[in-house]
Structure formats: structure tokens, C-alpha cells
A protein has these predicted regions:
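Generic beta-sheet signal
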Residues: 93-103
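Short, active-site-adjacent cap segments at secondary-structure transitions
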Residues: 17-19, 105-108
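Amphipathic, non-transmembrane alpha-helical scaffold segments
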Residues: 15, 75-83
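Short glycine/proline- and acidic residue-enriched helix-loop micro-motifs
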Residues: 57-77
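Glycine-rich phosphate-binding loop signature in dinucleotide/nucleotide-binding domains
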Residues: 2-6, 89-95
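Domain-level recognition of soluble alpha/beta enzyme cores
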Residues: 63, 116-137
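Short beta-strand scaffold positions
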Residues: 12-13, 80, 100-101
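Phosphate-coordination/substrate-recognition cap region in phosphate-metabolizing enzymes
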Residues: 1-59
Length: 137
């Protein structure tokens, strides 16, 4: 359980639901929460707010195809943003870091620590809401 884990610091997306979650988790911990713009969810552009079934979701997440969609952040730029964030925090002297983020961000984190998934795996990889995933570097 998350309450049994100790953290040095909390990094969080600045988006509302993530902020609320981080504040709930931190309620009795009193840790510093750093809201980092790089943890924002991927910009879905024209698909923002639509159902995954209304567009080719797996193609949207295809790293190899790196499709360009109107006003959307392409997947390779998105992964680079997350990888830059992870490079920054893993170069610091933290023992345990909590990252409160979104499912798309978690796709990039999973690839950063465990190697880039195939296009057939990236799209369908979807952790449960409020799931706890552990990584070591």
C-alpha cells in the first residue's frame, strides 16, 4: 500500500486531478510537492475529450509511425519531454520519489525504465487509475 511507502519528495503534474491526488497522498506526510509542467498529459489535439474508440488510439500512440495530428503533441516529442524530466530527477540524490501523473505519462515512464515497447504494446498499456508502479534505476 502507498501509505506504507516512504518518499523523499513528490513530483506532480500541474493538472487538477493529479494535484488533488498528490495533496491527498501528502496530507499526513508534509513533503514538498513539486508541480512540473513536463508531467502534463500528452496533448491530444483534435481528439481531446473524445472516446478512444472515436479514433485510432493505437496509431496515435505509435512511436514508430510518430503520426502528426492537428494541434496534438506527437508521441516522440511527448516521450522526450518525459525522458528529460526523468533524466533530471534520477540524476539527483533522492532515494524514493513519488510521481503523480497521468496514464500517457506512465506509458513513457514504463518505456524509460523497461525499454521502449513495441507499437503493439504502447497503445494498449494502460495502468489502472490510482495504481502504484515501482521502478528502480
Amino acid at each position: 500500500m502507498l501509505r506504507d511507502l516512504a518518499f523523499d519528495i513528490i513530483f506532480c503534474s500541474p493538472l487538477k486531478r493529479a494535484k488533488q491526488t498528490a495533496e491527498i497522498i501528502n496530507d499526513d506526510r508534509g513533503l514538498n510537492i513539486i508541480f512540473d509542467e513536463r508531467l502534463r498529459e500528452r496533448n491530444y489535439g483534435e481528439f481531446e475529450g473524445t472516446s478512444k474508440s472515436s479514433f485510432d488510439y493505437n496509431e496515435f500512440w505509435s512511436y514508430q509511425k510518430n503520426m502528426k495530428y492537428e494541434k496534438a503533441e506527437n508521441v516522440q516529442d511527448f516521450f522526450k519531454r518525459i525522458y528529460d524530466f526523468l533524466d533530471d530527477i534520477t540524476s539527483k540524490e533522492y532515494n524514493n520519489i513519488l510521481i503523480v501523473c497521468h496514464a500517457g505519462v506512465e506509458k513513457a515512464i514504463e518505456c524509460y525504465f523497461n525499454g521502449l515497447m513495441s507499437d503493439d504494446e504502447i497503445g494498449p498499456f494502460l495502468p489502472d487509475n490510482a495504481s502504484v508502479l515501482k521502478y528502480s534505476k
